[in-house]
């Protein structure tokens, strides 16, 4: 198995997932494409945690680019052996993957909390509050209650859709980074191959 090619594939996947996380998080600031709710601070508190922008986005780009460049990384070798240097590079990629695990974990946790609490919205009494906070997420299964939020229009659907996307994307990122931790350890211990013609064995 070529551990370097596997790492590079994971890296490219993480870049795409990170960009999607950033886009989903940005959309949370503009319900129905309107900017006034953000300027008036009438958004869910968990929107301001930047889970998709920072956790699933920017923090994910670090391990992504490390993994993408890993296959071309000749490292310095040790004792004149290039193979040793490549194995060290694979082991060091584990640290980058752990950063990715932390970022994606943060994204998943915040998205789950955002889904459980529900959106900040204007209720039928004309007050801005978290209408579904006391339902412990049960409102997700009872769409008939969503009409309790009168403004922003369709805010429940907006929040549920985007937080669900962040939850799914963060979960995929977490799994990929976990796979890279295993891949990096195996690659560091068992060897690293740079092409189909070259492979290092234990």
From Swiss-Prot:
Family membership noted in the UniProt record: Belongs to the L6 tetraspanin family.
Cytoplasmic side, ranges: 1-9, 71-93, 183-202
Name this polypeptide is given: Transmembrane 4 L6 family member 1
Keyword terms, alphabetized: Glycoprotein, Membrane, Transmembrane, Transmembrane helix
Subunit structure: Present in high molecular weight complexes in tumor cells. Interacts with SDCBP2.
Compartment annotation: Membrane
Gene name of the encoded protein: TM4SF1
Species per Swiss-Prot/TrEMBL record: Pongo abelii (Sumatran orangutan)
Sugar-bearing residue positions: 129, 159
Source organism superkingdom: Eukaryota
Disulfide feature: none
Broad class of the protein's primary localization: membrane
InterPro entries for the chain: L6_membrane
Membrane topology: Multi-pass membrane protein
Topological domains, Extracellular: 31-49, 115-161
Pfam families registered for this protein in UniProt: L6_membrane
Transmembrane intervals: 10-30, 50-70, 94-114, 162-182
Record's keyword annotation contains NAD: no
Annotated Gene Ontology cellular component terms: membrane
